UniProtKB/Swiss-Prot annotation:
Binding residues for ATP: 8-15, 34, 120
Catalytic activity: S-sulfanyl-L-cysteinyl-[protein] + uridine(34) in tRNA + AH2 + ATP = 2-thiouridine(34) in tRNA + L-cysteinyl-[protein] + A + AMP + diphosphate + H(+)
Cell compartments where the protein resides: Cytoplasm
General function of this protein: Catalyzes the 2-thiolation of uridine at the wobble position (U34) of tRNA, leading to the formation of s(2)U34.
Gene (name only): mnmA
The species this protein was found in: Chlorobium phaeobacteroides (strain DSM 266 / SMG 266 / 2430)
Annotated site residue numbers, Interaction with tRNA: 121, 334
Keyword DNA-binding: no
Protein known as: tRNA-specific 2-thiouridylase MnmA
Amino acid sequence: MTETVVVGISGGVDSAVAACLLMKQGYRVLGLNIRILDTPDEHPSLAPSPLLISDHADYQFPVFSLNLSARFSQEVIRYFQADYLAGKTPNPCMVCNKKIKWHGLLEGARLLGAERIATGHYARTASLDGRVRLYKGLDPQKDQSYFLWMLSQNDLNKTCFPLGELAKEKVRELARTFGVRAAEKKESQEICFVPHDDYCRYLELAVPGLKEKVAGGDIVDENGKVLGKHRGYPFYTIGQRRGLGLSSTEPLYVTALDQENNCVHTGNKSSLDTRSLTVSGLNWINNKSLDEPVEAFGKIRYRDRETPCTIAPLPDGQATITFHTAKHAVAPGQAAVFYHDEEVLGGGFISAVNRDR
């Protein structure tokens, strides 16, 4: 019997090529377009979608839509706002992957009677010793494994990544061969629900009275000396230099955001370096838990370079991470993700940063 795969269809070139590759390999493909910015549907259900992915008759397949706007608002937008109001720097894409995309795809597969799901992410999986391992995509410029650390064994067990061993240039080439309508579509780097990628303006409009509540707090130096007033701690980011409105004999950078005292801390560039941080919400992909310290390679942002670190478990899904060499401008709210060679071991959200002195 032909195996059925539900493919997440975003409208971009990657998901379209992933679907076409699976069709070429003999799978029965059904597309699922998850709607996240529509009018919320109180009882989400599958509906036929008019999306046509390819102009080539051999690569046309049914596409369904699933309105998860209410869930997206609850799980992603509220998280995004809450993290900024807590003085953190959120990463909504990885939360969306876990709480929206995989949730929706697995539900779609259940409703459509499909055995597997697939996405256009540049990542790979393999089964070993009865468990699924997650690996980097082979194209180092497009590897998206950093954004997938929250996935569970249940998520990965039914997932395939058709683009995991391909370079972006090859995907574009295949898109033209398959007659994909989005073959020349440019990639978007913006957060989908933040117009013009201006998160400050978004927060001002989304959170009534925010500007009045947070404006006028102190900007202080490393000794606690007041240097000036800020326009609201949520509107600053760790490592920021421009836009502080300060005059100083040396460049000053934002080193910490203190929500409790409505304070923005600053220091010189070296004060942004740290070797120690704490993560929470730890997800250890291949093992059920982390029981003892392990050595790994870690990164603290998408384009960061992985460097050696020691991961020591703490209670309640937390861990202390000690890097062998300093990381720069570590921001609470971002994710630390851990690797062994090409394998993604797991990750967690950065909850505290211990500055080196």
